[in-house]
Amino acid sequence: MTLVKIGPWGGNGGSAQDISVPPKKLLGVTIYSSDAIRSIAFNYIGVDGQEYAIGPWGGGEGTSTEIKLGSSEQIKEISGTHGPVYDLADIVTYLKIVTSANNTYEAGVPNGKEFSIPLQDSGHVVGFFGRSGTLIDAIGIYVHP
């Protein structure tokens, strides 16, 4: 099974965040936000068949957005913005996630430079990587094409 790493989008602040076991299936995502994306956590099944709980990366305050994917539901599109907030040069300010079941989830406030990753055909998001300190500085995705 091919795995593609796309991104990240955002700034260079914070520390690098990544997963150690390649992902096979994304189970759910939790995002905390306010004027920016404050934290992200997610659960996935690895290529080894084990379930992994990752994060939260960043801080946990703000409004919670919970995404629990159905057994055949997948993330088909992710978009958002990144830019200066809170005297920080470049952080992720907004995320919009669309699933194969046409569920749309939004977190944060659109502000800054836009990015969009619509996935073609059977492509779907199976995990995340990026940079974080007290907020999410940058975000990227793992995709099965």
UniProtKB/Swiss-Prot annotation:
One Pfam family it belongs to: Jacalin
Ranges where the record places region 2 X approximate repeats, Gly-rich: 6-64
Tissue note: Sheaths and roots from mature plants and seedlings.
Keyword set includes Repeat: yes
Factors inducing expression: In response to salt and related osmotic stresses.
GO molecular function: carbohydrate binding
Domain of life assignment: Eukaryota
Keywords associated with the record: Lectin, Repeat
Sequence repeats: 6-15, 54-64
SS bond list: none
Ranges of residues in domain Jacalin-type lectin: 3-145
Protein name: Salt stress-induced protein
Species of origin: Oryza sativa subsp. japonica (Rice)
Organism lineage: Eukaryota, Viridiplantae, Streptophyta, Embryophyta, Tracheophyta
